[in-house]
Amino acid sequence: MIGRLQGILLEKQPPEILLNVQGVGYELLLPMTSFYDLPEIGQETTLFTHLVVREDAHLLFGFAQKTDRTLFRELIKTNGVGPKLALAILSAMSVEQFAYAIEREELSKLTKIPGVGKKTAERLLVELKGKFKGVKQSDFFVESTHIPLSPSIESHSESSSDEAISALIALGYKPAEAEKMVKRVAKPELTSEQVIREALKAAL
């Protein structure tokens, strides 16, 4: 089992990246909450990983924090929640936000995530409620780290919006819905990652 990778970031196209580890290129899928923490292309990064083995593919998922991977593993244990849906959940909410929604039994927030219907949300509440009692109450309200604008990242509004729409579709949103979400928040000065984050935040 591959549990951790450290290497040079070669490519990033939300939610996928290519990581060079001693000459071997690893393709990883990341939730957007981890994607936001990535450095610039060409820089080194370390990710905690989880390997999903299927008949048709081996999928490697990466996480900036071990707590993100822990929640991912708890989610895929839940009946009806596969890796793709777990990725969408972790992209829409931080671990703290998800824990707070579970402990407060906020079904409406959970059902706004693509692929999470009422029954799935109820199963998540039943199976995961109480598992976050060790999380400090103050941690529930930690805001996502602000990402400064970087001149080295493509900031042209059209390409940023297109990349953001593609990423949201990959996370399970319907094309028309993804386009509407992006149009609502897109600004010329925002990078694709910032557009995605604002779109996901507005959706909740």
Curated annotation (Swiss-Prot):
The RuvA-RuvB-RuvC complex processes Holliday junction (HJ) DNA during genetic recombination and DNA repair, while the RuvA-RuvB complex plays an important role in the rescue of blocked DNA replication forks via replication fork reversal (RFR). RuvA specifically binds to HJ cruciform DNA, conferring on it an open structure. The RuvB hexamer acts as an ATP-dependent pump, pulling dsDNA into and through the RuvAB complex. HJ branch migration allows RuvC to scan DNA until it finds its consensus sequence, where it cleaves and resolves the cruciform DNA. The keyword DNA damage applies. It comes from Haemophilus influenzae (strain PittGG). Coiled coil: none annotated. Has three domains with a flexible linker between the domains II and III and assumes an 'L' shape. Domain III is highly mobile and contacts RuvB. It holds the Pfam family RuvA_N. Residues 156-204 are annotated as: Domain III. This is Holliday junction branch migration complex subunit RuvA. Its main location: cytoplasm. HAMAP family: DNA_HJ_migration_RuvA. Homotetramer. Forms an RuvA(8)-RuvB(12)-Holliday junction (HJ) complex. HJ DNA is sandwiched between 2 RuvA tetramers; dsDNA enters through RuvA and exits via RuvB. An RuvB hexamer assembles on each DNA strand where it exits the tetramer. Each RuvB hexamer is contacted by two RuvA subunits (via domain III) on 2 adjacent RuvB subunits; this complex drives branch migration. In the full resolvosome a probable DNA-RuvA(4)-RuvB(12)-RuvC(2) complex forms which resolves the HJ. GO terms for cellular component: cytoplasm; Holliday junction helicase complex; Holliday junction resolvase complex. Residues 65-143 are annotated as: Domain II.
